[in-house]
Regions:
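A generic alpha-to-beta junction signature in SAM-dependent methyltransferases
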Residues: 57, 121-123, 160
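Short catalytic micro-motifs in class I SAM-dependent methyltransferases
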Residues: 101-105
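Short, glycine-/aromatic-enriched active-site segment of Class I SAM-dependent methyltransferases
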Residues: 7, 127-149, 153-159
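Conserved N-terminal segment of class I S-adenosyl-L-methionine
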Residues: 1-96, 100, 110-115, 197-200, ...
Length: 208
């Protein structure tokens, strides 16, 4: 969860749960987890996804949660074994780096990928990246989350290929496009503020 979305509830939004399951499965298929020792989760937020990764990894693996918005309290919080937090770029070269819904927050995504993310990668490392899609769905919800943009598939892949070799690509969560489109339409009609994030969710498993 993005730190800006943290609320009073500890329940996870269904979208977060499905997203975590998707990326856990993707990582299990894409990386040789028996050889993964160092993991960096860039823009890790509250670190829930990073903690969900731990059971997949070898016992001596270390997951570093990197988020520039960590407070002093965040940095001294109790964390599970093998999980660390930092507000500055880690010096380690990781075997696996996750960058999930992060680069849309960065004004200069090109330089960020090249100069900040690139140096984190060890030889033969895997980088898993996701972004919000469909620029036409950019809304007040995106603005409230400090998103600079949404991406077309081509824009996203072109940006990645400037700095990395893209081994695989795909799309996901298309089932959320219709609800998002309805929300954007309501927002433009003045019937929705679009500002509620996953941290303010209090529904059941069938309510998003």
């Amino acid at each position: 969860m993005d730190l800006s979305e943290r609320g009073t509830t500890t329940a996870r939004h269904p979208w977060e749960v499905v997203r975590a399951e998707f990326f856990r499965d993707l990582i299990a298929r894409s990386a040789d987890l028996g050889r993964v020792h160092d993991v960096v989760d860039v823009g890790a937020g509250d670190g829930w996804f990073a903690q969900e990764l731990v059971p997949l990894l070898r016992d001596d693996a270390q997951v570093t949660c990197w988020d520039i918005n960590y407070s002093a309290d965040d940095l001294v919080a109790d964390l599970p074994a093998g999980v660390l937090r930092t507000a500055t770029r880690p010096s380690t070269r990781a075997d696996l780096v996750t960058l999930l819904d992060v680069i849309e927050h960065v004004p200069d995504d090109r330089s960020f990928l090249r100069d900040e993310v690139g140096p984190l990668l060890a030889d033969d490392a895997r980088l898993i990246v996701s972004v919000p899609a469909h620029p036409s769905l950019y809304s007040q919800h995106d603005a409230a989350l400090h998103h600079e943009r949404r991406y077309t598939r081509r824009q996203f892949l072109d940006r990645l290929r400037e700095s990395f070799t893209v081994l695989d690509s795909g799309s996901l969560f298309t089932s959320l496009l219709a609800p998002r489109a309805i929300e954007v339409a309501a927002e433009r009609a003045g019937r929705s503020s679009g500002e509620r994030g996953v941290g303010g969710w209090h529904g059941g498993p069938a309510v998003t």
